[in-house]
Amino acid sequence: MEAMTHAGQPNQRSIPHAIPVYFVLRENTFALDLVGPAEIFRCANRHLESEGKAPLFRMHFISAESSLTTSIGVGLTGFSALPESLPDDAMIVLVACTGSDDDFSSVAACETVAWLRRQVRPCHRLMTICTGAILAGHAGLLDGRQCTTHYAHYDRLRALAPRARTGRCPSSSGPVPARFEAAIPVPRWRRSAGWPSG
């Protein structure tokens, strides 16, 4: 039930603003990197809703392709095209892709890199998971940001983003739990000064 003002209108300050989270998907998306963080955001929303509160996250799954196959061979469809613009408070999640993290020659990969260059701005939050950082590096998004990647791709990342440093870029690599650890703190950022609370 919405809180009402004295004039009978919804009190906008009492209705939390759901943060738009955009998962950028590519061919051979590493399934765990997609499902793990998405489930954390979903569970956070479900917990809040069980307490009668509004959800914190509004997830969007986007791609330059109309369909794709994940790392485990399961096909994905039904996601949205890359949007023409992103809201100022958006979070963009870049996940790893098995066997294609160093290949950006396909039409879809080039479109994805070009879209990231056009759309991602300093006001946005960027989360890279494992070799999702390589995609961010290709798009020139890591200058002035903190990042890491799988050790086998570390030198390539340094070459792509020589000016990367401490910033607002949660990034995970290494063991399986790291995928989840990168997403777990995100609900707490909802209270930070950097994101609006309503």
Label every PLM stretch briefly:
Residues 126-127, 148, 167, 180:
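Structural detector of well-ordered beta-strand residues that form the stable sheet scaffold
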Residues 134-140, 173-174, 189:
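Acidic/polar active-site rim loop that often engages polyanionic ligands
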Residues 1-126, 136-138, 193, 197:
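Extended, subdomain-level signal for the structured scaffold at the beginning of enzyme domains
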Residues 143-171:
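A conserved active-site-flanking secondary-structure segment within enzyme catalytic domains
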Residues 113, 150-154, 189-193:
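Hydrophobic, well-ordered secondary-structure segments
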Residues 174-198:
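Conserved anion/nucleotide-ligand pocket segment
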Residues 136-151, 179-181:
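Short beta-strand and adjoining strand-loop segment in the mid-core
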